[in-house]
Amino acid sequence: MAKEDCIEMQGTILETLPNTMFRVELENGHIVAAHISGKMRKNYIRILTGDKVTVEMTPYDLSKARIIFRAR
């Protein structure tokens, strides 16, 4: 997936799901299922409930996302 095709949005982690999946509430109120990007997995970035994150979505399926950044 090319960078130009992605939609980046801010959100908050609502709950942790199995297999490193998370339920994220976006700023616009929508709730999506998100997984951690490979670089965050490789560097052992921990994500907890309530964390502010940046997610990347494809325009083809707006119910799934990839977490690409965790705000401090």
UniProtKB/Swiss-Prot annotation:
Enumerate the Pfam families for this protein: eIF-1a
Write out the entry's keywords from A to Z.
Answer: Cytoplasm, Initiation factor, Protein biosynthesis, RNA-binding, rRNA-binding
Q: Name one GO molecular function term.
A: rRNA binding
Q: Which InterPro entries match?
A: NA-bd_OB-fold, RNA-binding_domain_S1_IF1, S1_domain, TIF_IF1
Where in the cell does this protein reside?
Answer: Cytoplasm
Q: Does the keyword Endoplasmic reticulum apply?
A: no
Q: What does this protein do?
A: One of the essential components for the initiation of protein synthesis. Stabilizes the binding of IF-2 and IF-3 on the 30S subunit to which N-formylmethionyl-tRNA(fMet) subsequently binds. Helps modulate mRNA selection, yielding the 30S pre-initiation complex (PIC). Upon addition of the 50S ribosomal subunit IF-1, IF-2 and IF-3 are released leaving the mature 70S translation initiation complex.
- Sequence similarity: Belongs to the IF-1 family.
Q: Tell me the protein's name.
A: Translation initiation factor IF-1
Instruction: Cite the source lineage.
Output: Bacteria, Pseudomonadati, Pseudomonadota, Gammaproteobacteria, Pasteurellales
By which gene is this protein encoded?
A: infA
